[in-house]
A protein has these predicted regions:
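Metal-dependent phosphoester-hydrolase catalytic domains
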Residues: 1-41, 93, 204-211, 221-371
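Structured beta-strand-rich core segments of catalytic domains in phosphoester-bond hydrolases
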Residues: 83, 88-171
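Stable alpha-helical elements in mature extracytoplasmic
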Residues: 70-74, 92-95, 99, 124, ...
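Acidic/histidine-rich helix-loop elements
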Residues: 51, 59-68, 150, 183-190
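Metal-dependent phosphoester/phosphodiester hydrolase catalytic core
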Residues: 167-196, 200, 370
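Active-site beta-strand/loop signature of hydrolases that rely on acidic residues for catalysis
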Residues: 54-59, 77-97, 128, 163, ...
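Extracellular/periplasmic catalytic domains that process cell-envelope and extracellular macromolecules
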Residues: 46-50, 77-79, 102-104, 118-122, ...
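Active-site-proximal beta-strand elements of phosphoester/diester hydrolases
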Residues: 51-61, 138-142, 171-181
């Protein structure tokens, strides 16, 4: 199998010059080295044409609210993949733009407009792709349901985004979603209905067009085999067992929020889902290398809070000042809030797909001429 030359997808590490503080720069470099080693160990190497590394990642509130080192870590992870669906890109796309600067000129992205309304949460969704491996096939659009298929009388809270791509021999339509969340009875019912609606809608398209469709993103599925996952699979999509087994959240409770599901029609594409084809997948836990629990003290200067103290210039009045969190409070805030805001509360979920069908095609020709 041919592997891409490093020169084809090397990141722009000159971005490190943006970090002026010497200690912070040193920490970032050390953590990048650790992260790169972990990526080498856990994610397959990128190939020139044989495979496609497809992923989905909900990057929490993805805008310009992060430290430069965080953009470096996010870009490092993305650079090891070929095509990534990103959820929670905010209206101000400066965070995404910073990451694109680091990824370099061989990367491109396609993003939706902002979904309006309270449930839309001012979010976009986007696809990032390595143009060395993936081609945009000039079709893109947000999914709008027919009037007789509405969800409780309305469209999706956040419009799914469907784009046509090609990698190697594999031509496919890729749809990403960020399904509505909520714990009320009404919200739970709507979540299930949204999942069933998008799966059924795309399955009908796949069958009518005899085309291959993949749907991926944040479905807010609590666990494998529950009614939300069943809504996706009963709608006509298949989730390989090796993908189902990967929880994608951080925390004590195991959740399977993010998924990658397939509805394939080409005789060659179907091999992608062969459970015996050594297809690899995973959920990448970046906290093994960056923003680790033991690193919390390094970030105490940035984890401030507002407290009210007497105003020396105005007797009887108070004023707010910023103070550092310390001790147990700092540890808890770092674990539960700070590193989530800097990276995400989701792990990127990835799968390696075979996209070189040369052997199958040649074998088919041999059988035809042998008749």
């Amino acid at each position: 199998m041919n592997y891409l030359s490093l020169t084809n997808f090397v990141m722009l590490y000159t971005y490190l010059k943006k970090i002026k503080d010497a200690d912070e720069k040193k920490r970032t470099i050390e953590h990048l080295i650790q992260l790169r080693r972990q990526l080498d160990d856990e994610i397959p190497g990128k190939t020139a044409e044989g495979t496609l590394l497809l992923a989905t990642w909900n990057i929490r509130q993805f805008t310009d609210n992060r430290r430069p080192e965080s953009y470096m870590y996010i870009a490092e992870i993305l650079s090891r993949l070929d095509l990534v669906a990103i959820q929670e890109v905010k209206e101000q796309m400066k965070g995404l733009e910073e990451v694109m600067k680091i990824l370099g000129k061989n990367w491109a992205f396609i993003a939706t407009d902002v979904t309006e309304g309270k449930e839309g949460n001012g979010e976009r969704i986007a696809f990032l792709y390595d143009t060395n491996k993936v081609s945009f096939k000039n079709i893109a659009g947000e999914i709008v349901l027919p009037s007789d298929n509405l969800i409780q009388g309305v469209q999706f809270a956040r419009s799914p985004f469907c784009v046509a791509f090609q990698s190697g021999w594999f031509k496919f339509f890729l749809t990403t979603v960020h399904i509505i969340y909520g714990s009320t009875k009404e919200a739970l019912a709507k979540r299930e209905e949204e999942i069933k609606a998008i799966a059924t809608f795309l399955s009908n398209r796949a069958q009518n067009e005899e085309a291959s469709y993949i749907i991926l993103g944040d479905f807010n599925i609590p666990k494998a085999g529950d009614k939300f996952m069943n809504a996706l699979e009963s709608g006509g999509f298949r989730i390989p067992s090796h993908i189902k087994k990967h929880p994608t959240n951080f925390g004590k409770e195991i959740k399977h929020y993010d998924q990658i599901a397939f509805n394939l029609h080409s005789e060659y594409d179907i091999d992608i889902l062969d459970e015996n084809s050594r297809v690899r997948s995973g959920a990448f836990d970046f906290t093994k290398s960056v923003y680790r629990d033991e690193d919390y003290e390094d970030y105490i200067p940035f984890m401030t809070k507002d407290v009210s103290v007497p105003n020396p210039d105005k007797p009887g009045k108070n004023m707010k000042v910023k103070v550092e969190r310390t001790g147990e409070e700092a540890m808890t805030y770092f674990h539960d809030t700070y590193r989530i805001d800097q990276m995400s509360d989701h792990k990127p979920l990835w799968v390696e797909l075979k996209v070189d069908f040369s052997d199958q095609y040649i074998e088919k020709l041999r059988q035809e001429v042998s008749k």
